[in-house]
Amino acid sequence: MKPSVVLYKSLPEDLRARLDEHCHVTEINGLTAENIAKHEDVFRQAEGILGSGGKVDAEFLRQAPKLRVASSISVGYDNFDVAALNDRGVLLMHTPTVLTETVADTMMALVLSSARRVVEMAERVKSGEWRGSISSDWFGIDVHHKKLGILGMGRIGLALAQRAHLGFGMPILYNARKHHDEAEQRFDAEYCDLDTLLAESDFLCISLPLTEQTHHLIGREQLAKMKRSAILINAGRGPVVDEQALIAALKDGTLHAAGLDVFEQEPLPVSSELLALRNVVALPHIGSATHETRYGMAKDAVDNLIAALNGKVEKNCVNPR
């Protein structure tokens, strides 16, 4: 008998067919409290769930007593209570490898667009402000040969270092839990403590997961240690940066600019002061959002779920037994 699975994010037709081949699938539109209550009987029988977003905690698990596998179409898993999953023996699968290069592309795009004020300049042209030779108040700053600091040297950090060092001749500084031999050997990356990273980086690129230890890791005190000419890039998790402290630093000149793909609250409220600042490039959490990569993530999530339900957990498991 096929295991029962709740799908809470739609899939491409071929991937849905593959899932149907192996599982009895009930599809809902998001893992919301309303949908969970509406499909109470379905969740009571579910052995697997697959999707992105939503909160999976002890309360949810009480409503899904037969759950064995949760497969997330994402690399981050801060919306999952891993301790609660462990208590219940539920495996958590994610998609950490397929999006590496695409997210690194997005981070490099934020570096370039923030430094050269690409979004702001495009808007000026569209609004008819370009009427002759541009003056210095339209100028940006160079990227090549500037120091790029990476906070969190994982797969994405390494891919970013490759782009920055080989493509733009940028010296690489980094801080992580341990030395990264490949980054040091291939890209001459220099390990340093956080204070040194803050003080010396021309671009500080954050590629960290959200944990209790990383929440508001970058706040007022840390921003004050950065160069006034520095640019902060965050494509990791929004709450790693204290957003109010960042806004203050951008307004008073403590920090030159910021390129952001993640925020403390998503979607970013239209009332956010960040949206009123010309020295901010704000994207709607599109780090992995290309057709090719999102398809690859969905495929990995389907494969992960099917494998785990069949007791074949070889990769992409957050909490292997």
Swiss-Prot record:
InterPro entries in UniProt: D-isomer_2-hydroxyacid_DH, D-isomer_2_OHA_DH_cat_dom, D-isomer_DH_CS, D-isomer_DH_NAD-bd, Glyo/OHPyrv_Rdtase_B, NAD(P)-bd_dom_sf
Disulfide bond annotation, renumbered to this chain: none
One function term, GO molecular function aspect: hydroxypyruvate reductase (NADH) activity
Keywords: Cytoplasm, NAD, NADP, Oxidoreductase
Gene3D superfamilies for this protein: NAD(P)-binding Rossmann-like Domain
Residues forming the catalytic site: R237, E266, H285 (proton donor)
Source organism, top-level taxon: Bacteria
Subcellular location: Cytoplasm
Catalytic activity: glycolate + NADP(+) = glyoxylate + NADPH + H(+); (R)-glycerate + NAD(+) = 3-hydroxypyruvate + NADH + H(+); (R)-glycerate + NADP(+) = 3-hydroxypyruvate + NADPH + H(+)
Keyword NAD: yes
Coiled-coil regions listed in the entry: none
The EC number(s) this enzyme carries: 1.1.1.79, 1.1.1.81
Principal location listed in the UniProt entry: cytoplasm
A Pfam family it matches: 2-Hacid_dh_C
Keyword NADP assigned: yes
Gene Ontology, cellular component aspect: cytosol; plasma membrane
EC category: oxidoreductase
Annotated family: Belongs to the D-isomer specific 2-hydroxyacid dehydrogenase family. GhrB subfamily.
Quaternary structure note: Homodimer.
Free-text function comment from the UniProt entry: Catalyzes the NADPH-dependent reduction of glyoxylate and hydroxypyruvate into glycolate and glycerate, respectively.
Record protein name field: Glyoxylate/hydroxypyruvate reductase B
Originating gene: ghrB
